[in-house]
């Protein structure tokens, strides 16, 4: 879509969402590269164009880095968006990092400066991955992984990714894909519960991992328990695809840990700026080390989730709710993440809910109407989900006549 195309109003009462993605050679060729080039299935730092000193505020001090960059073209919105969440797939081992930036154009025609949406490295020995607090101006503000517009809606956005490595080093840093999901909350009456989407009676065999089994673990990475819904769900998804850390990666953990891969995941998704493990983009980025692509998306109905279940792909959803709003939950959650693994023959939602006390108790079934209402509500989840898939896996076809959402 070009910047001159007319924006179509989103359906009343329905979450509006669109995903802009750049994840192959042709897509990256449409942007502006500086010191980076496509090679071996990724955009790589090949000829650094500058040096900078980056001061890590979380303990590693200042280091000199050499860098290149890639800047996307402007991506127009089919509606006036209020929120944007970038996500990415990148190879950035110790000694490398990427910085993801966002610029918006509002419906009044004004362009913003660059917002920093994250400094990312898959390890933590050289630099700490972190978002940047305190970014706010007349056009919007950044809260960890999410940009929220103020005043005017967003008519277009662009992303810039800086690929950096320690000056004089030879670490390979590569960008395999970058995305931006933009959304607008529902307007008007709450839509009726969605009907069948093709996956009723399909339940995927996703291993169960409880965050409750890790209470008190690794306090430097938020201490397990209620804080580890993201790591538990991400570990489940990675394990579903037969991937994950090996025994040699886990030697620093307690040998009696019931599921050390959850602790490992928590360490490697922890956002030192946000001081937590719930950064959606970081959870979607972590699995790149195992050859998995991840993306943060927003979906307006469970019928979209059913498309992924039918394709054999479980998906993580984020919800906030009071216990009275979700029958069977047994407790309230200010910000939980659950893996949707399928649907009953009657259309109710089969999940792995990591709030359970043990791995054996995570499988639960929630009423379709209640789950969908909570997940889609503006204060309950806003339709946020993140998905993982192996390189080369075909995703479900887009919904005809609607903006792409994955």
Where are these regions (language model features)?
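Short linear interaction motifs
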Residues: 64-69, 80, 139-141
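Actinobacteria-biased recognition of intrinsically disordered, low-complexity terminal regions
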Residues: 1-10
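Conserved active-site-adjacent core of cysteine acyl-enzyme catalytic domains
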Residues: 38, 59-63, 72, 253-405
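Short coil-to-beta strand junction motifs in C2/discoidin
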Residues: 93-101, 334
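Short, surface-exposed loop/turn motifs at beta-strand boundaries within globular domains
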Residues: 65, 79-81, 95, 227-231
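Noncatalytic regulatory segments and standalone regulatory/sensor domains
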Residues: 13-63, 76-79, 99, 104-114, ...
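A short beta-strand element within beta-rich, extracytoplasmic domains
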Residues: 79-93, 161, 321
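Active-site-adjacent structural segments surrounding the nucleophilic cysteine of cysteine proteases
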Residues: 19-21, 162-276, 403-406
């Amino acid at each position: 879509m070009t910047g001159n195309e007319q924006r179509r109003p989103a359906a009343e009462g329905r979450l509006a969402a669109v995903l802009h993605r750049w994840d192959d050679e042709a897509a990256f060729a449409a942007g502006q590269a500086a010191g980076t080039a496509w090679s071996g299935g990724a955009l790589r730092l090949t000829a650094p164009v500058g040096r900078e000193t980056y001061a890590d505020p979380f303990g590693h001090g200042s280091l000199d880095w050499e860098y290149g960059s890639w800047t996307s073209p402007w991506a127009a919105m089919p509606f006036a968006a209020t929120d944007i969440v970038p996500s990415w797939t990148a190879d950035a081992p110790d000694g490398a990092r990427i910085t993801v930036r966002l610029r918006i154009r509002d419906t009044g025609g004004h362009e913003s400066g660059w917002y920093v949406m994250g400094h990312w490295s898959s390890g933590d020995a050289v630099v700490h991955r972190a978002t940047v607090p305190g970014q706010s101006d007349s056009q919007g503000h950044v809260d960890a992984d999410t940009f929220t517009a103020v005043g005017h809606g967003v008519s277009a956005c662009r992303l810039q990714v800086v690929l950096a490595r320690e000056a004089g080093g030879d670490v390979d840093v590569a960008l395999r894909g970058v995305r931006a999901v933009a959304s607008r909350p529902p307007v008007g009456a709450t839509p009726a519960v969605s009907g069948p989407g093709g996956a009723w009676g399909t339940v995927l065999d996703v291993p169960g991992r409880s965050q409750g089994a890790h209470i008190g673990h690794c306090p430097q990475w938020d201490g397990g328990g209620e804080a580890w819904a993201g790591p538990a769900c991400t570990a489940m998804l990675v394990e579903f695809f037969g991937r994950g850390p090996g025994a040699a990666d886990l030697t620093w953990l307690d040998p009696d840990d019931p599921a050390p891969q959850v602790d490992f995941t928590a360490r490697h998704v922890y956002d030192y700026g946000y001081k937590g493990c719930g950064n959606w983009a970081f959870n979607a980025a972590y699995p790149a080390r195992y050859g998995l692509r991840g993306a943060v998306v927003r979906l307006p109905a469970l019928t979209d989730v059913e498309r992924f279940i039918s394709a054999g792909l479980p998906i993580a959803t984020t919800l906030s709710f009071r216990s009275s709003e979700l029958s069977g939950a047994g407790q309230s959650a200010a910000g939980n993440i659950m893996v949707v693994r399928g649907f009953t023959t009657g259309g109710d939602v089969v999940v792995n809910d990591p709030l359970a006390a043990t791995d054996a108790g995570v499988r639960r079934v929630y009423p379709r109407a209640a789950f969908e209402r909570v997940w889609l509500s503006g204060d309950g989840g806003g339709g946020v989900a993140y998905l993982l898939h192996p390189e080369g896996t075909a995703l479900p076809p887009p919904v005809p006549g609607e903006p792409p959402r994955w």
